[in-house]
UniProtKB/Swiss-Prot annotation:
Any one GO MF annotation of this record: triose-phosphate isomerase activity
Pathway: Carbohydrate biosynthesis; gluconeogenesis; Carbohydrate degradation; glycolysis; D-glyceraldehyde 3-phosphate from glycerone phosphate: step 1/1
Lineage: Bacteria, Pseudomonadati, Pseudomonadota, Gammaproteobacteria, Legionellales
Family matches, as SUPFAM superfamilies: Triosephosphate isomerase (TIM)
Pfam family name, one: TIM
Organism per entry: Legionella pneumophila subsp. pneumophila (strain Philadelphia 1 / ATCC 33152 / DSM 7513)
EC number, UniProt record: 5.3.1.1
GO cellular component entries: cytosol
Quaternary data: Homodimer.
Protein name: Triosephosphate isomerase
Tagged with keyword Cell inner membrane: no
Compartments reported by the entry: Cytoplasm
Catalytic residues (positions): 95 (electrophile), 166 (proton acceptor)
Length: 249
């Protein structure tokens, strides 16, 4: 079901005091009728603590990563059943930093995507192009490859999931795609999914990630195919994050 979502990806930031204070501040500041589903994705070791700090039901917890097996000799990894034990609703898969630093390819990302779905959580599939790929006119080619990699399991694979367009050149750089640039790619993704399953395309939640902040969020969220944001650095500041959430209204 298509819905408005703002998710904060805290990446590898925070220790227990900071994490506890941050989630409490966010929850306190969201003292209004929120039009968006709000999620926070802390470092995995703090997921239980964040879950236990949530009091009002205004925020849900998500995970930044998962390994696509239920159990086994995979030292240091976490499975979807483990994340589900701590009430994770959303799980990032295919984030550009995982692709870049951990060499995760399309097949592995697809395995993660379906592993999350198979266990009743919502995968947030991250797709996006590098600056070089954009300058060489390969944006749509790259994104199509990333999106279609998860479609091998059948026509309903995009049901009950989220796709996040995160242009790699805009992540952590302070650069942001213009609302029109972002809308063009979001529409391209929706049309691409529509070629697989028109109904799922209409109900697909598409969010934008790439230096989203309180100054550009309103213009981005006003675009017809942008349903919210995947927020990085700004989600580590409670006031800034909540200002972004308010831009959904």
């Amino acid at each position: 079901m298509r819905q408005k979502i703002v998710a904060g990806n805290w990446k590898m930031n925070g220790q227990i005091q900071q994490v506890t204070e941050l989630v409490s501040q966010i929850e306190e500041l969201i003292g209004f009728d929120c039009a968006a589903q709000v999620a926070v994705m802390p470092p995995s070791i703090y997921i239980p603590k964040v879950r236990d700090c949530l009091r009002t039901g205004k925020i849900v917890v998500g995970a930044q990563n998962v390994y696509p097996k239920d159990y086994g000799a995979y030292t240091g990894e976490l499975s979807a059943p483990m994340l589900k034990d701590f009430d994770c609703r959303y799980v990032l898969v295919g984030h550009s930093e995982r692709r870049q630093f951990f060499h995760e390819d399309e097949n592995f990302v697809a395995q993660k995507f379906h592993h999350v779905k198979d266990h009743g959580m919502i995968p947030v599939l991250c797709v996006g192009e590098t600056l070089s790929e954009r300058e060489n006119g390969k944006t749509e080619q790259v994104i199509a490859q990333q999106v279609l990699a998860v479609s091998a399991k059948g026509k309903d694979c995009f049901r009950d999931c989220v796709v996040a367009y995160e242009p790699v050149w805009a992540i952590g750089t302070g650069k942001t795609a213009t609302p029109e640039q972002a809308q063009k790619i979001h529409q391209f993704i929706r049309d691409l999914v529509g070629e697989i399953n028109d109904s799922d395309a209409k109900h697909l939640t598409l969010i934008y990630g790439g230096s989203v902040n309180e100054n550009n969020a309103k213009a981005l969220f006003s675009m017809p195919d942008i349903d919210g944001g995947l927020v990085g650095g700004a989600s580590l500041n409670a006031k800034q994050f909540v200002e972004i959430v308010k831009c959904i209204n």
